[in-house]
Amino acid sequence: MRVAVDGMGGDHSPSAVVKGCVQALEEFKDIEIYITGPEDILKEAFSKFKYDKERVTFIDAKEVISTNEHPAMAVKKKKDSSLVKALRLVKDNQCEAVISAGSTGAFLTGCTLIVGRIKGVERPALAPVMPGKNGPFMIIDAGANVDSKPSYLVQFAKMGEVYFKSVMDVNNPKVGLVNIGEEEEKGNDLTKATYKLLKEERDINFIGNVEPREVSTGDVDVLVCDGFVGNTVLKMYEGVASTILSMIKSEVKSSFLAKLGVPFLAPALMNLKKKMDYKEYGGAPFLGVKGICVKAHGSSDAKAFKNAIRQARKFHENDLIGKLSEEITKKSFDNQKNI
């Protein structure tokens, strides 16, 4: 499998990106890395490690898209940027996947404009998988579409369902609609209309509305919402998780007795920290485009990049894009028959 990596994306590029690539090459013997960015800088970063040189290709790119640039304008103007060149590798079928920790807006825009949407997809969606009390869950959309229509959200539900079936091996994923109350009549015009449509979908296991306080239980596999709500839920969830871990650390240091208990609690605390660590999940897939596109966290370190590559590899092994295309095409055909 060939993976395109934006070598200059993220807060800690290129060092963290390169180190993550080296770790991935060591762990996964069936991958090749195509890394984009200033060739001299990238080669210098790689020279600090031992790696299989036959499995790394450097794609020279002189420009970098920053987070404060207008996404669409930057993608269209900076054709020699590390991000655009990485996306082009997927567009031209030179790579099966692309990973970037750079500007989220530019990445999502570039995926849509360059890689292109799967036929029948109205809007691609950002779909991070998060740790929950009883298992992982997906938030879709987590920021790609701030303004949405009911038909978009129904398609998000279908894409999330396909993901859980093919990647997570869940036979009948439970789909919920994020709302301010469980009752059908609760919410705004968007959620009310979406509820009715999802209720009519016979091939989606729709369980109804899900209140934000129930999001983290993991009892629902796919949480559907517009990008504004999804991004808010995602960032609040990350913030609360970080705060809880910090509070536990402070309490442990607060007294002598608490410190005495650390050896007994350490395994459980380490396990909790691992479950809540975004680095373990690598990145969020951008579902609905023709290639495997993974958005890594902006502050990703080497471990996060390695896991983003692991994630992309798993998507490829499970033919996620092929299954999404098949389901969307089937759904579009069924809709035409019913017109």
From Swiss-Prot:
Pathway: Lipid metabolism; phospholipid metabolism. Disulfide bonds: none annotated. InterPro entries: FA_synthesis, Phospholipid_synth_PlsX-like. SUPFAM superfamilies: Isocitrate/Isopropylmalate dehydrogenase-like (SSF53659). It holds the Pfam family FA_synthesis. It catalyses: a fatty acyl-[ACP] + phosphate = an acyl phosphate + holo-[ACP]. GO terms for biological process: fatty acid biosynthetic process; phospholipid biosynthetic process. GO terms for cellular component: cytoplasm. It is found in: Cytoplasm. It is an enzyme of class 2 (transferase). GO terms for molecular function: phosphate:acyl-[acyl carrier protein] acyltransferase activity. Gene3D superfamilies: Isopropylmalate Dehydrogenase. Keywords: Cytoplasm, Lipid biosynthesis, Lipid metabolism, Phospholipid biosynthesis, Phospholipid metabolism, Transferase. Its main location: cytoplasm. Its EC number is 2.3.1.274. HAMAP family: PlsX. Catalyzes the reversible formation of acyl-phosphate (acyl-PO(4)) from acyl-[acyl-carrier-protein] (acyl-ACP). This enzyme utilizes acyl-ACP as fatty acyl donor, but not acyl-CoA. Homodimer. Probably interacts with PlsY. Belongs to the PlsX family. This is Putative phosphate acyltransferase. The gene is plsX.
